[in-house]
Amino acid sequence: SVDYTLERAGIAHTAEEVNWLVAQIEKLKPFPDVPAAMEKLRKRYKLAILSNGDPDMLEAARAHHGIAFDHIISVAAAGAFKPHVATYTKAAQIVGVAMNEILFVANHAFDCVGAKAAGMKAAFIDRRKRPFGKWPYQPDMIVADFAELAEQLS
């Protein structure tokens, strides 16, 4: 998906550059509030990731984030990229939960809009205090960080 994104943006790149970038993405650590908030949420909810990343990249990243998820899902399972409705539908099927029972949490408006269009609820993590925008679908919740999300959902 990194290669696809760079090509769509018209950014010239080599295979080595893509490999380096993916290796850096795999090593990303969560924000400091995330691990404790996820543990709190884990007590009441199933936790899953739906990512535009490739399955191999997501598996490699698992070692670096240290958070136990019930499911780590690549959009490759749906054959499309977010925000295509098929990605959200496939994730719901994998998790085994109805679309309207899912709260999709994201820090990108397009993820929230896609989830809402697919029939999910959405929470927007607004760390940068920026307006959500005048999208046709708005999130059900807007919170500053995962700590606030966990507090509101507990």
Which residues does each predicted region cover?
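A metal-dependent, Asp-based hydrolase signature
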Residues: S1-N19
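Surface-exposed cleft-lining segments at the edges of enzyme active sites
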Residues: N19-K27
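Transmembrane alpha-helices of multi-pass, membrane-embedded glycan-processing enzymes
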Residues: E26-K29, N107
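Short secondary-structure boundary/capping elements
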Residues: K29-D33, P83
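Catalytic-core regions built around general acid/base machinery
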Residues: D33-R44
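Asp-based, Mg2+/Mn2+-dependent phosphohydrolase catalytic module
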Residues: E39, L50-S154
